């Protein structure tokens, strides 16, 4: 009987100790969880605070929801921004933004993505999910590469990549952009007009001023709907005669190149209303206009006079 009691007493003591140890362990675990809980709570509070800040920057304009951030510190956009996926336009300027988040693909209703004047270095391939996007504005950034997925943005009408400095090519797939009307690639490092631009059926306005163009493609006339072509401050020495087949062209800016002559075929470009050959080493010396305003206004007259004078001198030399 004593042995049984002793055994029961040992068993009871063992159970008590095990229970005590378990409670100590639970208390220890609870103490470890508390800092984590505090961190989680802090994260939740920070996310709510950030989301509230972003919501304050959303406004309605012309029936659209716009997110507008100007001169604030947003080097990276927080994940909580996806809670505002109904926004149709982003206008984020001078924030130091360095990266377009991959979750941009969740903004399926986005019409305008304007991230001008930031520090964006690349365009994510997820951009191709934005099939409703009409305007992509990334001028004054540091973009060096354009992904071919941009060619999937079938609604794109306006593309601005000016002053990215080192950008020097576009993927061929961009020729799929059947609605693209306006392209600004000025102040970059292009050595030639990207072939994809020649196959964009709706293109009307192209600025490639301030690049490194040394020549123009012979099939430049394929841009049949082009109305304005800006090629100022390049390294062009000649203009191909095929430019005469660009029947809708009404503005042609060639100032600040290395042109020595004007193609006679341009005399027949009846739609050409504004043309600028200023600051080129043209072979013939023509009388200067009274002032800059007059010179700009009579650019076409200067061109016609130059061509006629060149023809006359050629005949005189032949005789």
Map each language-model feature to its residues.
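A contiguous binding-surface segment within folded domains or other stable secondary-structure elements
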Residues: 215, 226-251
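The feature captures the LRR N-terminal capping module
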Residues: 1-196, 200-218, 227-228, 241, ...
